[in-house]
């Protein structure tokens, strides 16, 4: 069951283009930091990192573009995949009562776990950044251990 669309979308030429696109988007995401000067050394995490208090508007944009939009896209894609997994058996045998196969459920569960891990790993840092951007004085009241833990 190998789709012709897959061969067309993921040809060697297109795959190289996708890799170049990912790197170009990465550079595009980093460049604004140079102009806003938002990369600074933070002694709490012993690293040069994104300073959330430099520009509230910029921090909000970073959280939206780098966290909220990807979460929305991934949620939409996973829902579409799951709906397709549920609908395919009904299309093949419309009069029968299809059951979800164990491997289909396992695949969905794996995708869901990956999504949850992405959200769990990135949410604390992004929500702290969003809170600091909306209420800059809140930055001093965030416990150091919470801020440090959000990086790991």
Curated annotation (Swiss-Prot):
GO terms for cellular component: plasma membrane. Coiled coil: none annotated. GO terms for biological process: rhythmic process. It is found in: Cell membrane. The keyword RNA-binding does not apply. PANTHER family: B2 BRADYKININ RECEPTOR/ANGIOTENSIN II RECEPTOR, MELATONIN RECEPTOR TYPE 1A-LIKE. This is Melatonin receptor type 1A-like. It comes from Danio rerio (Zebrafish).
């Amino acid at each position: 069951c190998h789709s012709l669309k897959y061969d067309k979308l993921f040809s060697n030429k297109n795959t190289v283009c996708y890799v170049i696109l990912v790197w170009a988007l990465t550079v595009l995401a980093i460049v604004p930091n140079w102009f806003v000067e938002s990369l600074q050394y933070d002694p709490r995490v012993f690293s040069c990192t994104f300073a959330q208090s430099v520009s509230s508007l910029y921090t909000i944009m970073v959280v939206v573009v780098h966290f909220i939009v990807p979460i929305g896209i991934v949620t939409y894609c996973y829902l579409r995949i799951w709906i397709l997994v549920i609908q395919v058996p009904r299309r093949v045998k419309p009069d029968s009562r299809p059951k979800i196969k164990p491997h289909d459920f396992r695949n969905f569960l794996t995708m869901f776990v990956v999504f949850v891990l992405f959200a769990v790993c990135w949410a604390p840092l992004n929500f702290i950044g969003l809170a600091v951007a909306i209420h800059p004085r809140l930055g001093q009241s965030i416990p150091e251990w919470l801020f440090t833990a959000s990086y790991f």
